[in-house]
Amino acid sequence: MHTRKVKKVAILGTQGVPANYGGFETLVENIIGENCSNDIRYTVFCSAKDMPQRMKEYKGAILKYVNLRANGVQSIPYDIVSMMRCMRGYDTILILGVSGCIFLPFLRLFSRSRIIVNIDGLEHRRAKWKGWVKRFLKMSESFAIRHAHTIIADNRGIQDYVRHVYDKDAKLVTYGGDHVLVGIDKEREIEILEQYGLEPDGYCMSLCRIEPENNCHIALEAFAKSKEKLIFIGNWKANGYSRKLKEQYSGYDNIKLLDSIYDLEILHAMRKNCKCYIHGHCAGGTNPSLVEAMFFGRPILAFNIVYNRETTHHKANYYQNCKELLKLIGRVPDNGKKMSKVAHRYYTWKHVAKEYEALY
């Protein structure tokens, strides 16, 4: 009887696990552990600055630490140092994001590992990046796509972009979202709603980072002209854009602006009982918050871009401006069951974990 060889896989490019927040951190959290096959042995590179508890193992994965921050100006050296430390001893290196991929030609030169890069959501196109940062991210993306053995796109729109711009084929592996189904009882659910002054089907909901590319201003402008109630969760003190919106709209009786919430029980109760979920993102590939919302079977109103259409399999309802959104919230379409069906078929972490393992 032959035993299958255990594959050693290094994951780098995230803050690390346990996940506090962030799409890639949540991805790692859910492809290791109970969703991981017995013949895969993960090592996750973590930031010692961001993860001060410095656990040695987590959910069966080995944790190694780099003494730099994973985000901001240190993200590039953080990724490069991580790559240098995993040149030997791994069958596969999974890199999440492209910021350090200028080092990829050297990694290919000195390592025999299979290199897989998830290029995320075309970071260089985000409005928040300007000048040399934008050019650097575009160059890093180019290095990633040209030098990795396998490129992962989490959305068909990203896959089409890679084919059109680089004449390369990317593997489509989506994002999971069923970790948000925490299964709280009805009594706790009602308690949470009462805590926030909410009633089932009595409010619409949105959740995101408060940035221009997430079109928060469109949702707020629409609800300022409507009698419908909006619960909008985000980091309202993070930047000039968010602070300006908070100052402008916090006086409306039907608009409640809540600071970021990470408690899955609270989010479960809010998502499950909202009248509809509004998703304004216009950048990136598959947005985790959209996938998560789809699992609750509530109607989705999404900004009309290819990534959101692909994520929802063209079964949500879409808007391009305040006028179109105002029309939708005045008469919310019933697409919730379709959203739940798509989510349970394509966006479970068990499915996503197997898709990744097939590439190792």
What residue spans do the PLM features occupy?
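Membrane-proximal helix-turn-helix segments that form the acceptor-binding/catalytic region
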Residues: 84-87, 133-151
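N-terminal strand-loop element at the rim of the active site
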Residues: 4-7, 14-20, 33-71, 157-165
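Short hydrophobic beta-strand element within catalytic cores of glycosyltransferases
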Residues: 276, 295-302
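Short, structured helix-loop element that forms part of the nucleotide-activated donor/catalytic region
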Residues: 51-57, 190-191, 229-258, 265-266, ...
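Aromatic "clamp/platform" in nucleotide-sugar-dependent glycosyltransferases that forms part
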Residues: 281-282
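A conserved mid-protein helix/loop that constitutes part of the nucleotide-sugar donor-binding site
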Residues: 25-29, 205, 209-225
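A charged, aromatic-enriched C-terminal amphipathic alpha-helix characteristic of glycosyltransferases
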Residues: 334-360
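An aromatic- and histidine-rich active-site surface loop
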Residues: 74-87, 92-120, 285
